[in-house]
Amino acid sequence: VQSSPAARDRHQETIPSAEDRDTVAEETATTVITVTEENRRIRMKVELKDKERIDDLQRNGYQIIQNPEKFCFGMDAVLLTGFAHAREKDILLDLGTGTGIIPLLMEAKYHCSHLTGLEIQEESADMARRSVALNDLQDRIDIVTGDIKEADQIFPAASFDCITCNPPYMIGQHGLTNPEEPKAIARHEVLCTLEDVVSRTAKLLKPGGHFYMVHRPFRLAEIMTMLVKYKLEPKRMQLVYPYIDKEPNMVLIEAVRGGKPRMTVEKPLIVYQSPGVYMPEIYDICLLYTSPSPRD
């Protein structure tokens, strides 16, 4: 059984480090109880395993369990959820959810009817489930262990309003010393391909449903060809630049199942104005999580 996670710790710009956020790090297994007065709830008792930590997402008081040696989400997941739109009534699926960062951020932003994360690596899926429990969201978010290539067998056809994916960017296993290492699986198409993601998305989206993906610009021609092949019409695209004088290193894409041909190219998104200092637009994206703007 094969597939890949979407949340990852890639060698690229990431969100502020754990030292810059409210972080609880434990070297050994323990039990954590966090009381959040703002949300007037007591979090579930959640066990942390060796090397795991709890990071504050600064979104509705939500937190996430991560292991910096294996699974940490990056800027790509944050920007994808800032780019994506959903409605409260929507049912959402995140393909290759990793430790569950995208369902958590989308729930914080839109309070969707229900969200599901599909993840093949059990260790990541287990962290995602414990993060869901930590935030007392078991009634809103499900984490399913499974293969992206078998997603159309796991879920009913045309059952999701919105599908998100932060897939592996690199083709094949070139240069990998250990293709089974979690970070390698996250970055390279070891267990699933772009076509696997797009073809399963086409089967699982409702007619008129929206697909949101973050990827690398060097594969843009292939991405567009693949989307059109499976009748997912590209509708919106935004290139992401680390600095204003650098080449883009990410592309955000929205496609609609059965949509009419016409695509909007949004203005470029610049991440940093100087080393360690984000552009105002990046902070605006962060504010979206407490000020939802539902899709029409």
Where are these regions (language model features)?
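Conserved Class I SAM-dependent methyltransferase catalytic core
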Residues: 191-241, 248
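Periodic low-complexity repeat segments enriched in small/acidic residues
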Residues: 1, 6-38
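Short loop/edge segments at beta-strand edges and connector loops
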Residues: 66, 145-146, 215, 238
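Mobile active-site "lid"/loop adjacent to the S-adenosyl-L-methionine
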Residues: 167-196
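Class I SAM-dependent transferase core
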Residues: 45-87
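Conserved small/polar residues in nucleotide/adenosyl-binding loops
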Residues: 289-296
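Class I S-adenosyl-L-methionine
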Residues: 233-277
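Conserved SAM/SAH cofactor-binding pocket of Class I
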Residues: 83-165, 170-176
